[in-house]
Amino acid sequence: MDIKNMIINNPLIKNMIDKKEVGWTNPKEMNYTEYEKKLPLKDQELKEAEERLKRFAPFIKKVFPETEETYGIIESPLEEIFNMQKELEKKYHTEILGKLYLKMDSHLPVAGSIKARGGVYEVLKHAEELAMEAGLLKLEDDYSILADKKFKDFFSKYKIQVGSTGNLGLSIGITSAALGFQVIVHMSADAKKWKKDMLRSKGVQVIEYESDYGKAVEEGRKNSDADPMSYFVDDEKSMNLFLGYTVAASRIKKQFDKKGIVINKEHPLIVYIPCGVGGAPGGVAYGLKRIFKENVYIFFVEPVLAPCMLLGMQTGLHEKISVYDVGIHGITHADGLAVARPSGLVGRLMEPILSGIFTVDDYKLYDYLRILNETENKRIEPSSCAAFEGVVSLLKYEDSKKYIENRIGKNINNVYHVCWATGGKMVPQEDMEIFLNTYLK
């Protein structure tokens, strides 16, 4: 790989190496009508994922009492954040046309992060397959029986493993332990202590690594492959995780319907999602595109210090390039996004549908968190706050400004902006106070 040459001919990568914030629009994005003719996933697969989660709802309701109100459906609020919108406009000298909403996956039941979607789904699917193969479960059963001792005894013979910077580990660990599986979570150096402590309190074995996320995943995969009773949840390559995330789209559609909001050409939707390895934002993006088609525009946001998806997509090298290859160290306060190498599976699935990617300086994550807390009395993880950079920077860069003018034009006044908060509910109070009092600039 001729990195030197690539940098000389690529001003965007040069800016990334210089740790400057950048905005990029995706030149490979396809016209939706053309894209629809060759969908990589069958709609039936998305529907099956939704149906499976419905089957498991009685079990979820039984073992996670916080889901009682929603009858075992794991979902988060969608709320307008008008005061935040006004404060962002004032502080960053910008105009946010349309209305700003927060999708609060930060407050999802069970695991308190977006990973409660894909992570929970993949564990449930694996459990269903094992129980059905053993003749213990039938499709027409009331799945609350999975909480019975005979199932726990059955699952206790099996192991589930995952590599994580934190939130996926929590999601897999909590769900697997509730079913009775033995669980091993391989955690990178970036993982927060409280996340490791919480997992251990639920009987999960946590293996810590001095190195980064990629190493934790690699070791976890190797460890699991050597054990015939072990199943590995692969954040870099898992289609089951991806499918679990897609279900978010049909859920947010129902939330819009309830609010009397119709997404169409005149009232488009722009969604900003923090991105690490890519699985969660990729799955959500794919689902949104299938439902809102050409009327939704999706931007990922990554830390300036770990912009792996941007590097992979912009060069077209995907998982074959790491931020280390261009001299970026990958160490960031956005611990949930501290990933050096992107998922190739997701990068390729995003090529025809993603609008673009922004990067954000670490210091702003804490600034955004304080503004959200002061204006809306809501608290989320610093990693989640990356989403706000998207809405603030949309018209800041020439590229994204032109993109919006060409695609949306005067309808920008009617846009529904959704910042996707990816985690935060489970952060201990004392850690949150530290976040709120962290100033990097």
Curated annotation (Swiss-Prot):
Annotated catalysed reactions: D-serine = pyruvate + NH4(+)
Residues annotated with N6-(pyridoxal phosphate)lysine modification: 115
Cofactors, names only: pyridoxal 5'-phosphate
Pfam families in alphabetical order: PALP
GO molecular function: D-serine ammonia-lyase activity; hydro-lyase activity; pyridoxal phosphate binding
Class of this enzyme: lyase
EC number: 4.3.1.18
One BP term from GO: D-serine catabolic process
NCBIfam families: D_Ser_am_lyase (TIGR02035), PRK02991.1 (NF002823)
Name this protein carries in UniProt: Probable D-serine dehydratase
Species assigned in the record: Fusobacterium nucleatum subsp. nucleatum (strain ATCC 25586 / DSM 15643 / BCRC 10681 / CIP 101130 / JCM 8532 / KCTC 2640 / LMG 13131 / VPI 4355)
Gene label: dsdA
